[in-house]
């Protein structure tokens, strides 16, 4: 078993490495999208992409995709909507029927997000894109990108220290920041902040004076985990 003394420290930091990974992702794919959640981790990914575009003088719009899961906290929805009309982004806001699962008091139940056979918890924003039929959330990417011959990457704000499952999934890949997407052969998943800690995330947001979703302030006050993820799976 590896010991702490076996660690090899590099003369770099996660910020510099994050920018390098963003550059590698864009240089090795035909099409790149960031899957934005409104949360702190994907927000950092988005801002790293902006930094990369600015440094390289890239004038293309940044492809941003958001999936509104209907039962998300409204503070998250309102925060995400502030990005929709930003001229820097090609922003796709999806609010469509997705077959998913939710756990209520330890019991697993089926939930169709934005089910057209019932009243919705909240009305869809005017900018929302709705696909025909009901889709599975794990094949959503395939429906959007899987029919293309282009090499596509979806960037996620996944971090290894969030859970052992995520740590195992990241370290199992030969290239930790680019992993295969099991949904389609032409797709990969980019994880430029996989080795960032939560303190690194907030340090970056603070030093760059970047506004984040205010739900985190409430969670800190209540001593809750700092997450924007909904209860659906």
Where are these predicted regions, by residue range?
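Nucleotide-activated chemistry modules centered on ATP-dependent adenylation/adenylyltransferase
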Residues: 1-35, 40-233
């Amino acid at each position: 078993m590896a010991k702490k003394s076996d660690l090899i420290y590099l003369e770099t930091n996660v910020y510099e490495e994050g920018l390098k990974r963003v550059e590698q992702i864009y240089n090795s794919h035909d099409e790149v999208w960031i899957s934005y959640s409104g949360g702190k981790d994907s927000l950092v990914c988005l801002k790293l992409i902006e930094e990369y575009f600015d440094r390289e003088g890239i004038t293309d719009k940044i492809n941003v995709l958001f999936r509104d899961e209907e039962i998300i906290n409204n503070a998250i929805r309102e925060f995400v909507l502030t990005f929709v009309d930003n001229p820097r982004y090609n922003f796709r806001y999806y609010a469509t029927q997705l077959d998913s699962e939710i756990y209520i008091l330890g019991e697993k139940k089926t939930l169709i997000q934005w089910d057209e056979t019932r009243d919705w918890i909240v009305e869809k924003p005017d900018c929302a894109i709705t696909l025909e039929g009901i889709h599975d959330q794990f094949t959503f990417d395939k429906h959007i990108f899987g029919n293309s011959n282009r090499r596509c990457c979806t960037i996620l704000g996944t971090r290894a220290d969030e859970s052992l499952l995520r740590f195992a999934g990241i370290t199992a890949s030969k290239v930790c920041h680019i992993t295969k997407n099991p949904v389609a052969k032409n797709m990969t998943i980019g994880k430029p902040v996989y080795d960032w800690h939560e303190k690194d995330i907030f340090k970056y947001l603070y030093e760059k004076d970047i506004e984040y979703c205010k739900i985190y302030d409430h969670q800190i006050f209540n001593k809750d985990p700092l997450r924007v993820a909904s209860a659906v799976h």
